[in-house]
C-alpha cells in the first residue's frame, strides 16, 4: 500500500513550505514556497547561517533591502537545484499597500534570478492579496512575471486575483481554522469541524468550485495547514504547500487518498454568480468579512515583523 504522500501526489502537486534544503531533498516536492518567516527561521540555523554571512559580506554598503532580496534569491537558487519545478519568493510585506513599489521590487527579484541564470518561468513572486498587491500582480503578469498571491482568506480576494490574471493563489486553511476556533470558544467541537467541515477547508473548496465553474485558469494552492485531516480533505486541489513536519507524517502513514475535489464539482454550482472584481466591491466585501480582514492585517504585520528581524541580522553581519 502506498504512503499517504504518494497517494496524494496522484491528485495534487505537492509543494514544500520551507527554506530547509535537507527536508526538500528527503521529501521530493515538485515546487517550494518561502516567506520572510521561513527564511528568518532558516538563517538562524547553523547549517544556513553561512549563506547569510556570505551574502551580507559580499555586498557591504548596500541597503538591507537589497541584501534581503539577494539573500532570498540565493535561497531560491539552491532550492531550484533540488526541486524540479518552481520556487515562490516573497516581496517585502512592508510594500503590501504600495502598488508601484511592489512592481519595482518584483522586477528587481526577477532580474537577480535571471542574472543568476534562472529562467523567470521557474519563479513565482509572492505578494499579499491586498487590493494594491493584486493590482501590482496585474501589471507584473502582463510583463510575463508570474505571481503567487498569498494571505488570501476569502472568495472576493480570489475573484479579484482571477480578474487580474494572476498565475496562482494561496488560500490559507489553518489561519481560518484558528480564527473560527478562537471565536467559537467553549462552543467549538473539534470532532464536528474536521475534514470537509473544517472552516478553512470549506473556504478553499468554495474558491476551487468558483474557479472551475467559471473556467478560471489561475492555479489554486492550498496553504497554511494545521493537521493532516485538512490536507486530505483538499486532495485534488491543484497544488498544496505543506510543512516538512506534515509531509513527513504523510510519508510515514500508509493509506489510499481519494480525491476530495475535482474540476467537475465546479460545474455542479449552476447557480454561482461571478463576483464584481472592482475596487469598491473588493474593499466592501473584505471589510464585511471580519475573519478575512483581521487575518490579512495580522498576516502582514507578522511578515513585517520578521522582515525587520531579518534586516537586523543582515546589519549585524556588516551589510548596513
Curated annotation (Swiss-Prot):
Keywords: Cytoplasm, Pentose shunt, Schiff base, Transferase. Signal peptide: none annotated. It is found in: Cytoplasm. GO terms for molecular function: transaldolase activity. The active site is at residue 126. It catalyses: D-sedoheptulose 7-phosphate + D-glyceraldehyde 3-phosphate = D-erythrose 4-phosphate + beta-D-fructose 6-phosphate. The keyword Cytoplasm applies. It comes from the Bacteria. Its EC number is 2.2.1.2. GO terms for cellular component: cytoplasm. One of its GO terms (biological process) is pentose-phosphate shunt. InterPro entries: Aldolase_TIM, TAL/FSA, Transaldolase_1, Transaldolase_AS. Pathway: Carbohydrate degradation; pentose phosphate pathway; D-glyceraldehyde 3-phosphate and beta-D-fructose 6-phosphate from D-ribose 5-phosphate and D-xylulose 5-phosphate (non-oxidative stage): step 2/3. Transaldolase is important for the balance of metabolites in the pentose-phosphate pathway. Homodimer. HAMAP family: Transaldolase_1. Belongs to the transaldolase family. Type 1 subfamily. This is Transaldolase. It comes from Bordetella parapertussis (strain 12822 / ATCC BAA-587 / NCTC 13253).
Amino acid at each position: 500500500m502506498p504512503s499517504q504522500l504518494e497517494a496524494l501526489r496522484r491528485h495534487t502537486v505537492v509543494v514544500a513550505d520551507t527554506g530547509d534544503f535537507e527536508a526538500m531533498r528527503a521529501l521530493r516536492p515538485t515546487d517550494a514556497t518561502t516567506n520572510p518567516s521561513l527564511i528568518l527561521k532558516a538563517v538562524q540555523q547553523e547549517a544556513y547561517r553561512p549563506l547569510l554571512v556570505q551574502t551580507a559580506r559580499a555586498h557591504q554598503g548596500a541597503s538591507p533591502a537589497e541584501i534581503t532580496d539577494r539573500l532570498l534569491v540565493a535561497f531560491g537558487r539552491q532550492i531550484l537545484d533540488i526541486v524540479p519545478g518552481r520556487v515562490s519568493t516573497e516581496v517585502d510585506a512592508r510594500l503590501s499597500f504600495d502598488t508601484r513599489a511592489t512592481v519595482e521590487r518584483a522586477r528587481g527579484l526577477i532580474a537577480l534570478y535571471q542574472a543568476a541564470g534562472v529562467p523567470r518561468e521557474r519563479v513565482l513572486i509572492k505578494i499579499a492579496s491586498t487590493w494594491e498587491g493584486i493590482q501590482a500582480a496585474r501589471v507584473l503578469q502582463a510583463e510575463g512575471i508570474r505571481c503567487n498571491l498569498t494571505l488570501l482568506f476569502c472568495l472576493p480576494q480570489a475573484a479579484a486575483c482571477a480578474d487580474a490574471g494572476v498565475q496562482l493563489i494561496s488560500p490559507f486553511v489553518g489561519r481560518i481554522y484558528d480564527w473560527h476556533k478562537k471565536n467559537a470558544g467553549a462552543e467549538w467541537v473539534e470532532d464536528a469541524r474536521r475534514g470537509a467541515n473544517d472552516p478553512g477547508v470549506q473556504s478553499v473548496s468554495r474558491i476551487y468550485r468558483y474557479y472551475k465553474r467559471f473556467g478560471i485558469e489561475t492555479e489554486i494552492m492550498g496553504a497554511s495547514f494545521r493537521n493532516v485531516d485538512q490536507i486530505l480533505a483538499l486532495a485534488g486541489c491543484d497544488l498544496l504547500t505543506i510543512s516538512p513536519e506534515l509531509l513527513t507524517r504523510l510519508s510515514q502513514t500508509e493509506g489510499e487518498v481519494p480525491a476530495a475535489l475535482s474540476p467537475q464539482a465546479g460545474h455542479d454550482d449552476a447557480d454561482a454568480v461571478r463576483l464584481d472584481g472592482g475596487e469598491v466591491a473588493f474593499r466592501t466585501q473584505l471589510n464585511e468579512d471580519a475573519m478575512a480582514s483581521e487575518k490579512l492585517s495580522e498576516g502582514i504585520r507578522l511578515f513585517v515583523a520578521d522582515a525587520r528581524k531579518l534586516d537586523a541580522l543582515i546589519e549585524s553581519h556588516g551589510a548596513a
